[in-house]
Amino acid sequence: MHIPDGYLSPVTCAVTFAATVPFWYVSMRKLDRDLNGQHLPLVALVAAFSFVIMMFNLPIPGGTTAHAAGIGIAAVLLGPWAAVPAISVALLIQAIFFGDGGITAFGANCLNMAVVGPMVAAAVYALGTRGAAIGSRRRVIMAGLASYAGLNAAALLAAVEFGVQPLFFHDAAGAPLYAPYPLSVAVPAMALTHLTIAGAAEFIVTAGLVAWLQRSNPELLAPRRAPAAPERHLRLWAGIGALVVLCPLGLIAAGTAWGEWGAEDFTSEAGRAAMAGASGGVAPPAGLPGGFARLAELWSAPLPDYAPAFVQNAPLGYVLSALLGVALIVAGIGLSAGLRALTRRAG
């Protein structure tokens, strides 16, 4: 679901970025005013979890892959507004340092996964848990269903963004300039991936975490809670550490996620066959789309595909990338908190 550079026209990128900016602004104001910045440690924890869980790729029939995104647990623990910066920070680190998601498509990816996904998940969870006790089984089930709904809402929006490209952005001969597949292909392909494997993974991860938190940290599930002491998060950070160690399991699933093919896939016989196999047998247009070629190489991530060039062992490189990503998230949010505190004192 991470849209790379080259798949969306500059107009689409500008529109989706502009649509996301108000949500970033309001969410940061709410985080600062309503929560007084005291929940930032939990925001950092959720952002780190989202970053790492997205590294666990799962095989999809047709030769592609998908993953959970942490959308549901972000909505449950933080609420829809604080989830926006949490997921956005994870997506920013992924795009800049690891080339997972495009720089030009950053606004679109945030709109899908950091705004729409958590908003839908939070709405479903709030509706389904009204009047339910913190330790009730209903909260576990609704957390899973909410995460499933949020992930699929994000995937549907991404599919629409992919699918409208050939309709609005093509050359004089009708050849697509950016994403090659129309809505009739993009929507079913993304639905197959996220209504099944990815959605099930998001459901299981979120429901499992909520069930565990009911026993270990039930105060985190309270809608109007006081900020937890940092030591109350230690077990959660230990869990993220365990996920970092286990993240090379995400390398087992071969293939590329739908809509994330590289330039070489458009021009090689094997790549084109893989694209067609994942798209209901519909072959992509011949050649590399012109607009795609101009944007795809706009940014070269220093550690593309979570594979540091200086590490020859792929699993070790994957773990080091996960550690670096988590460290950057914590440092970035910590720096933000420090600057906010200095601003308050100066004011």
UniProtKB/Swiss-Prot annotation:
Membrane topology classification: Multi-pass membrane protein
Keyword field contains Mitochondrion: no
A Pfam family matched in the record: PDGLE
Subcellular location: Cell inner membrane
Keyword Transcription regulation: no
Assembly: Forms an energy-coupling factor (ECF) transporter complex composed of an ATP-binding protein (A component, NikO), a transmembrane protein (T component, NikQ) and a fused possible substrate-capture protein (S component, NikMN) of unknown stoichimetry.
Protein name: Fused nickel transport protein NikMN
